[in-house]
Amino acid sequence: MIKKLSLISLFTLLPASFYFAQTTVYAYVKDQEGKPVESAEIDLVQSTDDVKADKIGYFQFVDLQPGQYQINVSKPNFETKVIEFTVSANEKRRDLGVISLLPAPFANAGVMVIDDAASDSDEDGSSMQPTIGLLNSGRDIFQSVTAFELGAYWFRPRGVDNRYEDVIFNGVSMSKNDDGRVDFSNWGGLNDVTRYPYESVDNITPSAYTFGNLGGVVYYNTRASSYRKQTSLAYSFTNRSYRHRAMATYSSGLSKNGWAFTLSASRRWAEEGVIDGTQQNSYAYFGAIEKQFSSRHAINLTAFGAPTYRASNAPNTQEVYDLMGKNYNSYWGWQDGEKRNSRIRKTFEPIFMLTDYLKLGKTSNWTNTFSYQFGSDSRSRLDWFHGTDPNPTYYRKLPSYFFSKALELESDGGNDVTADELAEIEAVRNSWQTDSNVSQINWDALYRANYLNKTGMNGEKRGAIYTMVEDVNEDKTFNYSSHFDTMLQPNWKLNLNFNYQNLKSDNFRRVSDLLGADFAYNLNAFGGDNPYNVDDTNVEVREGDRTQYNYLLYRSSYAFNASTELDLPKWNVMGSIFSSYSESQRDGKYRHHYYLNTSKGKSGIYDALDGGVKGRVTYKIDGRNFIVYNGAFFSVAPTLNEIFVNPRVNERMTPGVSNQIINSNDLGYIHRGQVLKIRLSGYYTTISNSTDISRYYLEGGGDDNSAIGAPNAFIAEVLSGADKRYMGVELGLDVKVTPTLNANLVASVGDYEYTNNPKAYSYSDVDRTYFAADQEFGEANIKGLKVAGTPQKAFSLGLKYNSTKFWWLGVSANYLMDQYLDFSVINRTANFYTNPRTGDIYTATTGEYTGFDIPEANAENVAALLKQQKFDDQFMLNANAGKSFLIGKYRMGVSVSVNNILNNRDYVTGGFEQGRKSNFAASYEDNLNAEKGGYALFAPKLWYDRGTTFFANVYLRF
């Protein structure tokens, strides 16, 4: 009797919800033809209870408590559908019926194009990098719009550089060891197999597969059986960096004996892109083969690569654009009736991955991947030895130079420029616009110069004046990654990740074309004709030989990451920690004549220890409303390019280089309704102790006579210990006006700036007189200057009509604000306003060249000269449309997207100050040249938007 009473007492203490009938909710997922959508993912919002549809499209959730729920039903190539439902007390089973998924218009259209040509420039091109925001397009309205609409105009969410983003294939990071950036060209053109990531998290949200960085994680699982069984053919026509794209993809699905195959190939090509002289011929291939030994064990072999040949385009000063138009490109010239570009990027870095999938018990999985990547990345350019600069935009060849010379002749205070001088200037301008031998590279003249120089006065053989060379990077990277996950409890998940990577990077310059000469000299024309390698007595080099620099870089790293997620009725909590260790070393193969003791052989080892923590806390107000906090505090080890400041010539490590410290927080509100969806968030991020290095070629050198015999000096401007702050708010609204019409509004208001005055240095691989070795300039006065490379404010208003007849039409109005010019580091130091002859601040004087009055270099006058340029705000109009068809068992679709419909050519997508006039007097005189009616000789170099661009696509799937 006592036992019975005890049991009765125990049951009376149980919560009332225990007595409610726990409910099973089920449904069927089908496509527009009524066929089951196998493996559709059903996400029970803010819960770890996610399931997949089986072979007949069926899924169910069991033991749901009474309450309001929301599920997201998704599958690659289909639009995600959101379903809301209520579970009532005493309801044993709830039938949601048939959930129909429609083909995703953008998935079929292929209109999202990552222009990997943006990373080709070596003219301070770091501010012109694509971001993984372009890959992160399907999660919510804010990310979709910033990818498709604003991303086309180089908008970066939260101002985050590509350096702080992660793209992962099967546990292997695609970030390059030299600069930390993702090189999208390694898989460019493989849209069919990389369209849908396995995991995609934005910003600092913790990931299950890696700790990540500041700018989010995109994770791809290339398991062959994960791709939908089908054959896909597609052709695209566009006027962007290429004209044509053809793709073919085949996925076998999983056979009865456990085999699965996925193959994909593509080609992108153009005789000439929208920018003059930019031809392209790029291929890509992908193969994945999987063998399932049982339901618990499988292996998968993946291989992909993208052999790419692509011509680059140059940034120009405003004078050049005004002369020749926005599509002008100085890198090409006519040769034998064809356009030949001097700046060609050729890449082919295939990667092979072997992945083992093992299921342990009922709730644990262990995945291991071994990978090996190798290949070459080369970028060509013209080089010269005791010759004049062949670049048509060299400042002495421009009308502004002749205008400045005319001003010099009028230093007596009379008329600025005479009529005869104006006529001469006009003749120069006219020759630019009518004679391609003036406005473009004159290849015939280069061949002729080499031919006439083959033999000296005494009959001796002489080497080339002009050559084509390639800067080559050949990496060999081995990687091992391991991922383990387990459910500790039904609502508690644990992830463990380990990664080891080993890199050997071979870097050198190679002679690619002697331009008719018999050989070239491995001599420094700007260094007394001393050999670049004093240990080699043979200074003659021929096509295919290495020249000027030759060194290896080594890096090995180990990383461990653990993350956990706990789901509670009103809360969802996720935390992640990591630690990593890396070693980096340089091994020089040439003994440079300037650095006899520090150029050849192995350097010391630079080691770095990293660590950090991330967290996310979600409070579930109810089934539709959530408050989400993300926080992160971690360090980032410097890249190889940040460690070795001038590796072409010596082993010198960047002064003060050490780990960056990142502290980032954001707080957001999310509403997910049937009619209205809202995402509102605010963020605050600091990056401390960063090393920022701008590398570029300085045309000519340091003085007015250096055009003769001076190859382009390779300059490194260094900011050591820079602090930056990023803060702002983001808003995304999606309103279902009618069942077929959606309206969306996206706003991003940011403020990104430098918050301290770091140390500045400058290095050159050629000229020790103008840029002395290890030259320190003291503090750079950059506090308060804006971070360049992205509009800091952006707005988009869009409408999209989805017809029940399987066609759609979308339009968006976009407004971009607060885009800034990248600044010259040296111009922000005391060197700028200090007279090198006296060591004092410049006093009021008469111009050395023009004879005009130059004021004192006081704070007001210096600030006026160095004010950071802010570009004008711009409006862009985009549209897209498409339709899909069913023809028997075949699915066909056509689509077209048009960006910048109004052909706005005033939008500056990026630019940088030149560092040639790095003192107050010279800079003031240069600006006077513009004020008197000409142009500044060393004005900023800019990139402009390409105007109206389109992308048309047709596909066939069966």
Protein language model annotation of sequence segments:
Residues 23-26, 232, 237-269, 274-313, ...:
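Transmembrane beta-barrel wall of Gram-negative outer-membrane proteins
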Residues 290, 298-355, 378-469, 528-542, ...:
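Acidic/polar loop-and-plug regions of large Gram-negative outer-membrane beta-barrel proteins
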